[in-house]
Design a protein with these regions (language model features):
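Short, solvent-exposed turn/loop segments enriched in Gly/Ser/Thr/Pro and often Arg
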Residues: 48, 171, 216-219
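GST-like fold's C-terminal all-alpha helical module
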Residues: 90, 115-207, 212-214
C-alpha cells in the first residue's frame, strides 16, 4: 500500500494527495488504516499530543478543536477534523468501504455512530482512569470499566454470527478495531469475548492494518489476545 511519511515516499511514486495530521491513538489509527486500505497516497505528520503540539497555531488552522486526526486533501483543498467525518469523506471520495445498498448503508451508519458515542468516549475514559490515573478515583475507574465491558458485550453478541460488523469489511470495522486494540490498557479479559477475538485477529492480519497501525511512527507489534 502507498504511504508517505513526513514527505518521504514509502512504497510508490504516485502523486501526494492528502496530508494526515495524527498520533498513535485509536482515533488517529482509524484514518491511517483507512488511507492504507484505500491505497491513497498521503503524508503523515506526527502531532505529539503528549507534548501539546495539538495546540500550536498552525495545527489549529486545520483542526480548530485541537484534536487529532485531521486531514488536508490537496485534490480539492478540503481540510477536515473528526475521525468519523474523515472516514465518511474518504469513503465517498473513493466509493469504497461503505455499503451501497441503502438498508445496509444505514446499518453501517448506526454502528459507526455507536462507535463515536460509545466505545470512543467511554473507553477513552477507561484509559484515563485505569492506565494514567490508577486508583486515584475508584468510583470513576469502576464506572467506566463496567461501561467498557458492557460495550464489549454488545459487540461480541453482534459478531456471534457475523465475520464483520456489517456484512463485508467496512469503515465501521476500521472505526471500532483501533479501540479494541487497546484491550490491555483497558484491563479487558478477552477470553470473555470470543467473537471479538476472532474478528479482531482477522483484521489484525490485514497488511493495510499492519501498516496503518505504525503511523505516524512505529510503536511495536499489534497486541494479540492470548489463546
Amino acid at each position: 500500500m502507498p504511504c508517505w511519511l513526513d514527505g518521504r515516499l514509502h512504497t510508490d511514486g504516485r502523486k501526494k494527495m492528502i496530508d494526515l495530521y495524527t498520533w498513535t491513538t485509536p482515533n488517529g489509527r482509524k484514518v491511517s488504516i483507512a488511507l492504507e486500505e484505500l491505497g491513497l497516497a498521503y503524508t503523515a505528520h506526527a502531532i505529539d499530543i503528549t507534548q501539546g503540539e495539538q495546540h500550536k497555531p498552525d495545527f489549529l488552522t486545520v483542526s480548530p478543536n485541537a484534536k487529532i486526526p485531521a486531514i488536508v486533501d490537496h485534490d480539492n483543498q478540503y481540510s477536515m477534523m473528526e475521525s468519523g467525518a474523515i472516514l465518511l469523506y474518504l469513503s465517498e471520495k473513493t466509493g469504497q468501504l461503505m455499503p451501497t445498498d441503502k438498508s445496509r448503508y444505514w446499518q453501517a451508519m448506526q454502528w459507526l455512530m455507536w462507535q463515536m458515542a460509545g466505545p470512543g468516549p467511554m473507553l477513552g475514559q477507561v484509559h484515563h482512569f485505569t492506565k494514567f490515573n490508577p486508583d486515584k478515583s475508584p468510583y470513576a475507574q469502576a464506572r467506566y470499566l463496567k461501561e467498557g465491558q458492557r460495550l464489549y458485550g454488545v459487540l461480541d453478541r453482534h459478531l456471534q454470527d457475523r465475520q464483520f460488523i456489517v456484512d463485508d469489511y467496512s469503515m465501521v470495522d476500521i472505526a471500532v478495531w483501533p479501540w479494541i486494540s487497546r484491550f490491555e490498557w483497558q484491563t479487558i479479559n478477552m477470553n470473555d469475548y470470543p467473537n471479538i477475538v476472532r474478528w479482531y485477529t482477522t483484521i489484525a492480519e490485514r497488511p493495510a492494518v499492519q501498516s496503518g497501525y505504525q503511523v505516524p511512527k512505529p510503536t511495536g507489534s499489534i497486541p494479540i489476545p492470548a489463546t
